[in-house]
Amino acid sequence: MWWPYLVLALLSGLEASGFPRSPLRLLGKRSLPEGVVDGVEVYSTKISCKVTSRFAHNVVTTRAVNRADQAKEVSFDVELPKTAFITNFTLTIDGVTYPGNIKEKEVAQKQYDKAVSQGKTAGLVKASGRKLEKFTVSVNVAAGSKVTFELTYEELLKRHKGKYEMYLKVQPKQLVRHFEIDAHIFEPQGISMLDAEASFITNDLLGSALTKSFSGKKGHVSFKPSLDQQRSCPTCTDSLLNGDFTIVYDVNRESPGNVQVVNGYFVHFFAPQGLPVVPKNIVFVIDISGSMAGRKIQQTRVALLKILDDMKQDDYLNFILFSTGVTTWKDSLVQATPANLEEARTFVRSISDQGMTNINDGLLRGIRMLTDAREQHTVPERSTSIIIMLTDGDANTGESRPEKIQENVRKAIEGRFPLYNLGFGNNLNYNFLETMALENHGVARRIYEDSDANLQLQGFYEEVANPLLTNVEVEYPENAILDLTKNSYPHFYDGSETAVAGRLADSDMNNFKADVKGHGALNDLTFTEEVDMKEMDAALKEQGYIFGNYIERLWAYLTIEQLLEKRKNAHGEEKENLTAQALELSLKYHFVTPLTPMVVTKPEDNEDQTSIADKPGEDAPYAATSTAYLTSHQSPPTPYYYVDGDPHFIIQVPGKNDTICFNIDEKPGTVLRLIQDPVTGITVTGQIIGDKGSSPYSRTGKTYFGKLGITHAWMDFRIEVTTEKIILGTEDELSTFSWLDTVTITQTGLFVAINRKKNMVVSFGDGVNFVIVLHQVWKKHPLHQDFLGFYVVDSHRMSARTHGLLGQFFRPFDFEVSDVRPGSDPAKPDATMVVKNHQLTVTRGSQRDYRKDASVGTKVTCWFVHNNGEGLIDGVHTDYIVPSLF
């Protein structure tokens, strides 16, 4: 049972190509703010956790600034639970956002292969220890520039030993001016307890930095240490924030079950309390081959002795040891009486290593022993059987073919009881152990070779030590529920919880009934939950302040998780179908899974660098870095096209290392078609505004774009951007945001990020990326008013049929400039340009690129084409006038 676990670290280093600065140059330098390490200041780190009904939505945001006088590489590291799905990542440099795009693995694989062939690979996500996988991305940041990293991931919190636990392992590695962990919890059942603690700080110091509270359905935890509280000593400049921050809570349970319904999706939680424990019949099948010698066998003995101390007198048990052959403690199961337990301890203390690894015969002997006990009625009728195997290697004697061992075990068990496989260390075929466990209603777990391996073994036993119900079935009215997640379980263990989710066939349903049936220690039990939809709506109204579609996403999370699990031991057409279902949902709900990596494009030295974040499997050794398809490669420079200012159209021509620009002089209110692609269905239009008080009939004076329209015909999606607000969605369902918002919106094939008062990014999958810049002027300015700039950052997925004032230039074209001569302005020479079979007189000038700085911009020199771009654009500029934005 994995718990939410997150490690945060931010590192900085010298640019690879830079030389160490002379110490003499540092003398007399101005002092840098505290928290600056190697020229980079991490001035803000916030971990925002929003939990609604066990479903956690976590956002990790780190902001840094390069205070050095040269470029620096800044890295962002987050360790997150292996069971979590990354849902979003954005990298923002000087106000320009670069989003991550989630895509099918086959597409990303091509980029991986290309990078490998070029010798350029670097992992974004890789396995990292027992419960974690590490997300890492780095970027070169120019002197004086700021960078923001934001990672979002989601996970269903599992109940373990009677509580939900969220671990945040914090490692900023330097003092951070604004460091905060902020967790909001909403539980419709009501919160019964909430606590938080940190392993890296004393309770006295923690108390002043930590606030925690809960009342009714809401809980809140905030940890905001000051700079002084972060210091490892009163005069130190290094941070003591290095350890676990733990949030623990549980909920009220007036009844064993709880059903919640939102927007046609439901989740059904089930966790009965106070039931007597079902006696268990347990066989431990232990590998004692030569590879278990030393600490492994010693730790195994310690763990088994502790397990014997926890056995209940109603339980039955036996030990089977396998090496080259098979040895049993007793010929059959025996009751856990005090005398038998003492004899068992003597046997365990005598266990020693020898021989090879005969997994097949060891397992079959244990299965036969449990089967015989049930058939011969030597164990209680109302009891449950469990087999636990521990091995540290692969079968190498007897039957050693993994597929044949799986077949033998499957036929022997016949679904009667679960098999739990524990893999000790890394030198084994974990996929084999996991597949065999899953197809026999169990799970596999890796036991890590460490000083606490015995505690890991004990911990697993404690999870299965107290079954309260067996053969659990969750039932709903026939034809009322669609797309149901797993609803049958061989056992329900004390302190845990089952979660079943699905979709209502009729969203107008007034009520429905949910039954949970299972075999208890004394009798068969049925737990019924009556769901009244009106009462449900009233009870859940408060949850809107967290996030409203949480049950639908929870359902998607569970469904994908279970499809991927089934896929592990499926074959042929069944595996193809499971893969297709999981892939479709992963793309729809924007989850990074083993089928859907995330591609992150970031700027590196005027080139785009593409990195791929894949999700590694448990079979990957956690120290390895080459087990996942995680790549980084350099792609050719991307040409840019934009319109900003008066309005100035700027076209950077690939292969020419030069830029062309032109103006369109039209009266305010005119709408121009900027881009139209009939293949992708993407259209962009812009409406012209003038200075304050300008006449709608006048073409004189400065004009700008005050409104932009973006549509995607095939997605039935549109965006209207003004200097005041952003309206987006389908024609029937529109959402409105202001430029005061900071918002990220994702759905399949779409990413939108609004950066407060700066810009917004619009991406249609990988290969179509626009940036809209907001220019704000003094509100009381007598002449000028706010306006917009439109930038095409990436267009390589647009088709060859794309047209429009900007779109026509996405296709390759050439031009030649000659006869450079003095112009009417000595600072702006004239020249002759030959382009598209036209000979034009052009003037050298400069415009501004405002993507990184909307107030000052970056100077761009260009050849200016006069007369509304005549001779450069296809046709005349009036051909591009359209009646409206949409």
Swiss-Prot record:
One of its GO terms (biological process) is hyaluronan metabolic process. Coiled coil: none annotated. Keywords: Cleavage on pair of basic residues, Glycoprotein, Protease inhibitor, Proteoglycan, Secreted, Serine protease inhibitor, Signal. Residues 26-155 form the VIT domain. It is found in: Secreted. The modification Aspartate 1-(chondroitin 4-sulfate)-ester is found at residue 646. Residues 19-30, 647-886 form a propeptide. Heavy chains are linked to bikunin via chondroitin 4-sulfate esterified to the alpha-carboxyl of the C-terminal aspartate after propeptide cleavage. Residues 279-439 form the VWFA domain. Glycans are attached at residues 88, 577. One of its GO terms (molecular function) is serine-type endopeptidase inhibitor activity. It comes from the Eukaryota. The keyword Heme does not apply. GO terms for cellular component: extracellular region. Residues 1-18 form the signal peptide. InterPro entries: ITI_HC_C, ITIH, VIT, VWF_A, vWFA_dom_sf. Belongs to the ITIH family. I-alpha-I plasma protease inhibitors are assembled from one or two heavy chains (HC) and one light chain, bikunin. Pre-alpha-inhibitor (P-alpha-I) is composed of ITIH3/HC3 and bikunin. May act as a carrier of hyaluronan in serum or as a binding protein between hyaluronan and other matrix protein, including those on cell surfaces in tissues to regulate the localization, synthesis and degradation of hyaluronan which are essential to cells undergoing biological processes. PANTHER family: INTER-ALPHA-TRYPSIN INHIBITOR HEAVY CHAIN FAMILY MEMBER (PTHR10338), INTER-ALPHA-TRYPSIN INHIBITOR HEAVY CHAIN H3 (PTHR10338:SF115). This is Inter-alpha-trypsin inhibitor heavy chain H3. It comes from Mesocricetus auratus. The lineage of its organism: Eukaryota, Metazoa, Chordata, Craniata, Vertebrata.
